Amino acid sequence: TETAGSVGYDLAGASYDSVSFSVASQDNIPTGLVFNTAGTKLYMGGTQNETIYQYTLSTAFDLGTASYDSVSFSVSGQESNLQGFIFSADGAKLFVVGAGSDTVYQYTLSTAFDLSTASYDSVSFSVASQDSNPYDVIFNDDGTKMYIAGIGTDAVYQYSLSTGFDLSTASYNSVSFSVSGQDTTPVGIRYNDNGTKLFMIGATTDSIYQYSLSTAFDLTTASYDSVSFSVASQGTAPQGVTLSADGTKMYVVDAIGDAVFQYSTVAYTQTLDLSTGTTFSFTPSGATTVSLTNPPATGIAIGFTVEIIGDASAITWPSSVKWPAGVAPTATATKELYTFVTTDGGTTYYGKKAAEGIS
């Protein structure tokens, strides 16, 4: 049995989708972007007009289907240098951070994710004591933790809210995490769906960096994964990053190109169950990691073949596979056949390419 799967939030395998969407007609200095939960609404903030704009996507998270709703919301009454913004999980609250006042502002939307119903709550929270140039704001799932990225100190700061998504209950945790080793202008941050990965986009290197948190949403447990992805080929002034709900798509807004760019961040997997047969075949959807499961017991030899139809150039085999001369064979974009043998219960597999260019 062959079982295909996919995993999101894979920055190491990220690729540009050759899909972009211009926001120049709304703002010439776009600085942030957010989706609603369903991916059918996109929001872009711009510091030219200190305004957030609302767009509709007819296909969820597909930037190629985006169009402007002719709906916007000005925050100029509170902030003169809009940089980042985020919604609460239910879309009933909006939070804006800016480098003009070094402050986070809270708004209410009477209809979830509908900017036309937004109003200021007259609630704010200063982060100036931590950073004089805050550029982004995000929360954990229940709104009891808030995080600020600042370019004044090249760090991310953590705050607690005793009542979720209620900025009036916020306090600084005295917890911060420096990203200066990767980029000295951290303009955007996002978590994955469970808070074990943090992504930071930097405007100095035009790259996105990946970090792991051993305890979800706890910055004291963060460490750099030594994984990054350059977006310089699309734009040299990235200002914000966000991801789809499942992490298979990533989006970057650029202030020079005045556009949003779409990327794929999905890793494909293929699991081969050796208890179900000795002949397997699959067609990769992209870069794929192969797993071999349920080999026979030690002392029982088994041989099996794997047919790969299509481009096998980005196949990652298990480390337990030993190849001739210690190197996995060079793959081609044609149909290929691989053979494997194990006699020790799958501790070691001996593999070789048996044929290629099969028609």
Label every model-predicted segment.
Residues 267-318, 335-336, 341-359:
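Exposed extracellular interaction/assembly regions and N-terminal maturation sites
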Residues 37-38, 89-90, 141-142, 191-194, ...:
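Residue-level detector of Asp-centered blade-edge/turn motifs that repeat once per structural unit
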Residues 199, 239-266:
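Blade-level signature of beta-propeller repeat domains, shared across WD40, Kelch, NHL, RCC1
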Residues 47, 99, 151, 203, ...:
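Short loop/turn segments immediately following the C-termini of beta-strands
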Residues 17-24, 69-76, 121-128, 173-180, ...:
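A short beta-strand motif characteristic of beta-propeller blades
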Residues 2-11, 56-65, 106-117, 160-169, ...:
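Short loop/turn segments immediately following beta-strands, especially the blade-tip
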